[in-house]
Each structure stands twice: as structure tokens, then as C-alpha cells.
């Protein structure tokens, strides 16, 4: 081989060692180093011994996802970053132990596929499907306590932490709930993998569901043309010999998982070193995000996620500045990788027009690779006259419309949408073609946290977004 080859080999080994030192040493990151930082929105467990036992148990359990899958998602999101794909992220506000069953998971999977096929056809580009599922249990709260009828108890923080029932026993944080959340997430992952490859994702079947949707009163006139054009396209593909037996893309799909990485003891315990690359991945989900309340640049959540190699999201509210986002990008994506960072805008229909354009202009000058998506739910939450927390469909749509209009005006790419939704026929958000009123909310108000779009509202929103991304 010669001396030059040997020298090059030695240099490669040294460079690899330097890279490992940089990753593990100079960054001063380990999966438990977040414990030295200021942290918000964490429960106070009464029994530290029980907490330690639960953490150690989680560390022995298999990963819920694999590093290679997270890398695949990053590659898919890189296409979104380049304007060649679209991100559809959606699911429950907060998963619960009591409502866990195969039917609910199937129905959520179905409505995501229905939305995705509409968006794919309209946008002429792949849709990256990411569920708020298989781990979306913990919820940040605006107050540490909740009061009902003069009784004050700790706030409900999600089933992974404490119980929804309003009594003193249920509201005590229990670390063993992390174990139950893990096993439920594992079961959910198993179902999602089966649904993705077991025939439920067949494009013809998904389109038939959509045709059933537009048969409902007043919907055919609005959305029928797009649905029928899609039917014609699928029929043409079939005539050309492209079917489930010879074209896997017709009957199979990929659905990734995500959740807010809020409860850091759980996330730490499921963070593993990839045997192929030596990089650390949070194997509780393919993608994690940091909430608006916990995105402090010097706080524990940003520090923890800076060290894992999953794709990451950050929720951005109306008080954020471009400098805040630039600082977060430098901390979470120092290599400026396309597909690594998703900025999720959640400003509200009344504020996005004033705040977002300036932010986009400043960030554009920095040349940062960012996937921009819109969360039109959190900034549009109101309290109805009858006491129910709700969201108006028209306000949700208005923020989505503004998001696309602003990106178009600024020459940037509106890359996706992030929704709290369900496959069930709940009555939690008002409006839509079925004109749910505040009086209707009591019929099937089932959320344990924030109001969700029901299956019809979510699909209708997809048809309306299709008009915004439509390419002739």
C-alpha cells in the first residue's frame, strides 16, 4: 500500500478520536449533565428512592426507536428544509392511560393518512408524517396548582406524572407512571409499525375514506373536485400496472413519532449511544421538541437536547425575537444541518402578522437551515361562555393562512403544520363545516388537557391547506 496510505490511515484515526473528544468532552455533555442546570416544569417526587428505581428500570428496557430511524427522519426533514417536502405533525394534546386502545390509535393513523394524501396530491411533493404519539404524555402547566370548589391541589401534568382525577392521592407525582408510559408507548409503536405495512395504508383505501368524507352535506361543492382528481390519478396508476403487489409505496407508508421532551428523567433513561456512530440518541421518539415555556437558552431542556442527535423542534410564541431563535439554532444545531431543527410558530391569529415577518427577515440573513411549521392551536385558545376551554376553527385557519402568506411574501418556505387533533368524533373545537357551537362542546368533550380538532375538522383543514400549497 505504501507509506502515504499508512499516514492517511493514522490521520483518519486521529481525526475520528478528535471528533469523539469534541462530542463527549469539549461540549461537556453527558446524558445526565442537564441536572446541573436550571430546570422548569418538573414534578416534585415525594420519594427519591422510588424515582431512582424507576429511572434504573427504564435504562434496562429496549429503545422505543432506533438511531437509524431518527437519521432517516432527519434526511426527510432536510427535504422539507429545501422546499421539496411538507411536514404534517399531529396527534393528541396529551395521551392518556385510560383512553388507550387499538381503535383510537387506528383512527388517528387513518386521519393522518387521509390528510397526507390530500396534501401530497395538492403540493406535488412528499409529506413527512410525524405523530404526536407513543410518548406525548407530559404537559407543562401555567400554574403549579389547580383549585376547584375551594379545594387546592397540584396541577395535573399528564398521565406520565400524576392522575387526572381531582383528589389528593391522584395528584401526587408517581415515578412508576414513567414505566407504564413506556409500555404503552411500546404497544403504540408496535401498532403503528403494523398499520404502516399491513395494508391499512393502501392509497386506494385512504382515498375511499376521503370520498366518504365529502359525501357529507355541503362538502362536495368545496372539496369534491380535488378528491375526484385524486381518484382519477390512482385509477391511471392502476391501469399502468402500478399496484400494491408490485409498488410498495402504494400500500405502505412511514409514520414517525414525536413528543415534547419535558420530563427529563424519562428522556435521560431512554437516551442511548448508537453503536454505529458513537452519537447519542433519545430513543423515546424519532423527534423531540422543546416547549415555549422551557426553551431558556441556559436551561436544562436546551442543554439536554443539544447533546442528542434526533431531529428537534422548538415552539416559538409571540414574545420571541429573531435573536432568541438564532441563539437556539446555534445551541441546538451548531453544524447548521438541514433537517435537524424545526421552528414551530405558535403566535396566534391576531399576532402572527405583526411578529413573524421581521423574524423571518433577520433569520434569512443568517443563512440558517430551519424547517418552519405552524402550530395554529395554542395561540388561539379561549374560554367559552359555558366554561369550556376551546379553539375556533376559523381562527386556526386564519393563522395557517397568515403563515403561508407571510412566507410567500418573505421568500421563505412554509414547511409544515403541527396540530392537536384526534381521529375521534369529539366536540372540543368550535366551527368548521359542521358548525359546532359552544353549546355543542358538552356533547363529547373528552380531552384531559387542551381542545383538539376532531377527525372531520382535521381533514377539512387539510383540504384547505391543500389550496394554499397547490402546485399546478
Residue ranges of model-derived segments:
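Short, positively charged and aromatic/hydrophobic N-terminal segments
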Residues: 7-12, 16-23
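N-terminal basic/disordered segments at the start of proteins
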Residues: 25-84
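Short, compositionally biased low-complexity segments
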Residues: 29-34, 43, 77-90, 142, ...
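A general structural signal for short secondary-structure junctions and capping/turn motifs
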Residues: 77-80, 118-120, 304-305, 406-410
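Short loop/turn segments at strand-loop or loop-helix junctions that form parts
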Residues: 88-93, 130-133, 374-377, 420-422
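Active-site-facing alpha/beta catalytic cores
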Residues: 94-95, 99-348, 391, 399, ...
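Non-transmembrane, aqueous-exposed alpha-helical and coiled segments at domain scale
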Residues: 340-372, 378-426
Amino acid at each position: 500500500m505504501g507509506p502515504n496510505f499508512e499516514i492517511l490511515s493514522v490521520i483518519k484515526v486521529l481525526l475520528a478520536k478528535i471528533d469523539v473528544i469534541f462530542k463527549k468532552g469539549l461540549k461537556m455533555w453527558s446524558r445526565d449533565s442537564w441536572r446541573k442546570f436550571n430546570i422548569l416544569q418538573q414534578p416534585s417526587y415525594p420519594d427519591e428512592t422510588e424515582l431512582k428505581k424507576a429511572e434504573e428500570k427504564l435504562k434496562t428496557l429496549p429503545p422505543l426507536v432506533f438511531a437509524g430511524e431518527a437519521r432517516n427522519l432527519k434526511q426527510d426533514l432536510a427535504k422539507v428544509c429545501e422546499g421539496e417536502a411538507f411536514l404534517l405533525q399531529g396527534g393528541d394534546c396529551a395521551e392518556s392511560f385510560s383512553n388507550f386502545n387499538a381503535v383510537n390509535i387506528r383512527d388517528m393513523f387513518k386521519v393522518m393518512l387521509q390528510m397526507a394524501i390530500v396534501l401530497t396530491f395538492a403540493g406535488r411533493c412528499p409529506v413527512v408524517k410525524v405523530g404526536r404519539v407513543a410518548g406525548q404524555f407530559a404537559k407543562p402547566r401555567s400554574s403549579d396548582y389547580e383549585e376547584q370548589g375551594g379545594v387546592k391541589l397540584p396541577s395535573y401534568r399528564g398521565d406520565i406524572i400524576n392522575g387526572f382525577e381531582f383528589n389528593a392521592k391522584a395528584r401526587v407525582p408517581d415515578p412508576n407512571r414513567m414505566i407504564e408510559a413506556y409500555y404503552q408507548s411500546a404497544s403504540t409503536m408496535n401498532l403503528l409499525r403494523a398499520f404502516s405495512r399491513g395494508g391499512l395504508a393502501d392509497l386506494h383505501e385512504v382515498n375511499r375514506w376521503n370520498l366518504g368524507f365529502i359525501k357529507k352535506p355541503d362538502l362536495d361543492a368545496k372539496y369534491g373536485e380535488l378528491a375526484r382528481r385524486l381518484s382519477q390519478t390512482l385509477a391511471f396508476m392502476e391501469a399502468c400496472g402500478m399496484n400494491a403487489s408490485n409498488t410498495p409505496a402504494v400500500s405502505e407508508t412511514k409514520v414517525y413519532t414525536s413528543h415534547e421532551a419535558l420530563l427529563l428523567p424519562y428522556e435521560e433513561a431512554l437516551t442511548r449511544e448508537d453503536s454505529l456512530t458513537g452519537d447519542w440518541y433519545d430513543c423515546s421518539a424519532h423527534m423531540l421538541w422543546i416547549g415555549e415555556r422551557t426553551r431558556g437558552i441556559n436551561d436544562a431542556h436546551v442543554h439536554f437536547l443539544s447533546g442528542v442527535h434526533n431531529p428537534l423542534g422548538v415552539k416559538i410564541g409571540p414574545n420571541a425575537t429573531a435573536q432568541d431563535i438564532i441563539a437556539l439554532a446555534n445551541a441546538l444545531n451548531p453544524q447548521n444541518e438541514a433537517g435537524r431543527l424545526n421552528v414551530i410558530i405558535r403566535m396566534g391569529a391576531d399576532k402572527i402578522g405583526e411578529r413573524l415577518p421581521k423574524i423571518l427577515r433577520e433569520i434569512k440573513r443568517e443563512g440558517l437551515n430551519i424547517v418552519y411549521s405552524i402550530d395554529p392551536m395554542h395561540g388561539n385558545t379561549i374560554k367559552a361562555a359555558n366554561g369550556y376551554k376551546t379553539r375556533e376553527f376559523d381562527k386556526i385557519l386564519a393563522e395557517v393562512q397568515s403563515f403561508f402568506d407571510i412566507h410567500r411574501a418573505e421568500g421563505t418556505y412554509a414547511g409544515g403544520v403541527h396540530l392537536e387533533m384526534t381521529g375521534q368524533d369529539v366536540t372540543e373545537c368550535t366551527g368548521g363545516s359542521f358548525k359546532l357551537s359552544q353549546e355543542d362542546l358538552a356533547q363529547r368533550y373528552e380531552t384531559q388537557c387542551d381542545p383538539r380538532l376532531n377527525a372531520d375538522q382535521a381533514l377539512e383543514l387539510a383540504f384547505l391547506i391543500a389550496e394554499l400549497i397547490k402546485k399546478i
